[in-house]
A protein has these predicted regions:
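Membrane-interfacial segments
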Residues: 97-105, 154, 189-194
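Hydrophobic transmembrane alpha-helices
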Residues: 90, 94, 98, 144-152, ...
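Membrane-interface alpha helices of multi-pass inner-membrane proteins
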Residues: 147-149, 157-171, 180-181, 204
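Perimembrane helix-loop-helix junctions
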Residues: 176-204
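Membrane-interface transmembrane helices that cradle and orient dolichyl/undecaprenyl
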Residues: 138-157, 190-193
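Hydrophobic, aromatic-rich alpha-helical transmembrane segments
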Residues: 1-4, 76-80, 129-137, 155, ...
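Active-site lumenal/periplasmic loops and adjacent helix-entry segments of GT-C-fold
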Residues: 12-113, 122-144, 167-172
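Start-transfer (signal-anchor) and selected internal transmembrane alpha helices
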Residues: 1-13
Length: 204
């Protein structure tokens, strides 16, 4: 419960710092497509929407399908999903911080510095957290848990969360998969314990 309350506190602080958006930013590439899909005849002159729907399958297909049936046209419902995914993301990073920091206050400060002081400090706006519900937020929430389980050397949940992240945003899952696999191989080669490499999970 303490981790949940701490994650909720982080969410409240980040909301004050970054705000919350609906129908703007990257959501402008998703919501019109969903609306046009459910209301034939709308956005007929919009080349992006027409091309998106005509393409059938793309990197947002899974997220698009889920959001369509999870209340995309209800702002309050979209905010609830944003809240849940954000809290899950923060909890994962609190768990990661706990692997190297024993004091709860220092764990909180370490994670808070990532999501508050580190905002807009990455290359190409590739943030860990987004102030709107988009595929990258959902994928990075799952990928953060994958990273935690990888650090704990629990490879079954690691690969499960990676697969989920990959379905939600392929590049997020693929990038973390490559990084963790290479890191595992390098570490185990150095330690001369190649037999303990989780080949079955990697192949799956």
């Amino acid at each position: 419960w303490l981790d949940i309350l701490t994650a909720l506190l982080l969410y409240a602080i980040v909301l004050v710092y970054q705000g919350y958006q609906y129908g703007q930013g990257d959501q402008s590439q998703i919501l019109p497509c969903l609306y046009a899909q459910d209301h034939p005849g709308t956005y007929t002159d919009d080349h992006y929407v027409s091309s998106y729907l005509a393409g059938k399958v793309n990197e947002r297909t899974i997220f698009h399908f889920l959001l369509r049936y999870l209340g995309y046209n209800q702002p309050w419902m979209v905010w609830i999903w944003h809240l849940l995914l954000s809290v899950s993301l923060f909890m994962a990073w609190l768990k990661i911080a706990s692997l190297g920091i024993t004091h709860k206050v220092y764990q909180f400060l370490a994670v808070a510095s990532i999501f508050i002081l580190g905002f807009l400090s990455s290359v190409g706006s590739n943030e860990l957290y987004y102030n709107m519900l988009i595929p990258s937020l959902a994928a990075k929430s799952m990928a953060s848990w994958a990273l935690y389980f990888w650090l704990k050397e629990k490879y079954t949940p690691w690969i499960v969360f990676l697969v989920i992240a990959g379905y939600l945003q392929p590049l997020v899952g693929l990038q973390l998969f490559i990084i963790t696999v290479i890191s595992s191989v390098v570490q185990l080669v150095i330690q001369k314990k190649s037999k303990s490499i989780p080949w079955r999970s990697i192949i799956v």
